[in-house]
Amino acid sequence: MIGKVAGTAAIAGISFLAGKYSNDDLPIFRNVQSATNVPMNQIQVSEPMTVKPASLNADAMGPSRSAEIMKHGYPGFTNVRTYEDFVLSYDYKTRTAHWVCEHLTPERLKHAEGVDRKLCEFKPDITFPQKFLSQNTDYKCSGFDRGHLAAAGNHRKSQLAVDQTFYLSNMSPQVGRGFNRDKWNDLEMHCRRVAKKMINSYIITGPLYLPKLEGDGKKYIKYQVIGDNNVAVPTHFFKVALFEVTPGKFELESYILPNAVIEDTVEISKFHVPLDAVERSAGLEIFARLDPKSIVKENGAKKGGLLW
């Protein structure tokens, strides 16, 4: 865990999210004080054995980029898959990912000649057990989009790279108009614009299932499921972006958005939250290997002196 986000921007973002769009009286937003952690240098972490999807020619992927993509730490180690351009942890219960991590550079964000999104097909990753897979039929007539976690627009360096973003393991049910096709897309494009100016960018994205205070005064976690395979519909989504501005110096942005229609007039900065709020909500440690002192700006607020 890197630590709490300071500054009025983060506080305002939490208030907006909790008040207008989020579930009521969430403890993660009322108390975001960091728990005591064991220093990372006292923990020995082994990288998980990752599997290359068998439904595409694994040899075409070349050497694994997992060490490069996951340089700043794995948020978890459950059912990890390494694709050409991103790493994913899959949740058998919800039929969606726990998290997806992307590593972007200006070079890797270039749109290679001949790469065509229209050639991509939504399909299950058959390296996971059949009984835990979602299918296209689960989404049909559900009222939800097959929403990308690792954005297809980030991975146009090769046809294989963009094809792999269409695995259903990288999808989660998202409200279409007003969210997936609008505000969520705005956030993806924002991260891509910033990443084109940075040395390296690391983006971790995932679903959330947050509690809501109901009329009886008790809090419940409730979410819809769709299709014969009971694919879970998240109540919210998170995205954490780590941008390397200069060698060894980073800017961090953390967001939680409701899986709901969001007005066009609302700025994405309104959904800034402390990183600690994301971690508590998701049950994940994000960028745990990163030295907190290397973060020079969080959610737009400078910390620890000037970078320039």
Swiss-Prot record:
Give the location in the cell.
Mitochondrion
Biological process GO annotation list? apoptotic DNA fragmentation; DNA catabolic process; RNA catabolic process
For this chain, one GO molecular function annotation is: DNA endonuclease activity
The record's listing under CDD domains reads:
NUC (cd00091)
Reported EC number(s) for this entry are: 3.1.30.-
GO CC term, one of those recorded:
mitochondrial inner membrane
Origin, by domain of life? Eukaryota
What cofactor does this chain's UniProt record say it requires?
Mg(2+)
Which keywords annotate this record? Apoptosis, Disulfide bond, Endonuclease, Hydrolase, Magnesium, Metal-binding, Mitochondrion, Nuclease, Transit peptide
Question: InterPro entries annotated for this entry?
Answer: DNA/RNA_endonuclease_AS, DNA/RNA_non-sp_Endonuclease_sf, Endo_G_ENPP1-like_dom, ENPP1-3/EXOG-like_nuc-like, His-Me_finger_sf, Non-specific_endonuclease
Consequence of gene loss (knockout): RNAi-mediated knockdown results in accumulation of apoptotic DNA in 1.5-fold stage embryos and delayed appearance of embryonic cell corpses during development.
Active site location? 148 (proton acceptor)
Any Pfam family the entry gives: Endonuclease_NS
How does the annotation summarize its subunit structure? Homodimer; disulfide-linked. Interacts with crn-5, crn-4, crn-1 and cyn-13.
Remarks, miscellaneous: The active site contains 1 hydrated magnesium ion that has only 1 direct interaction with the protein; all other interactions are via water molecules.
User: Hey, which family's this protein in?
Assistant: Belongs to the DNA/RNA non-specific endonuclease family.
Q: What does this protein do?
A: Endonuclease important for programmed cell death; it mediates apoptotic DNA fragmentation.
Record's protein name: Endonuclease G, mitochondrial
Organism of provenance: Caenorhabditis elegans
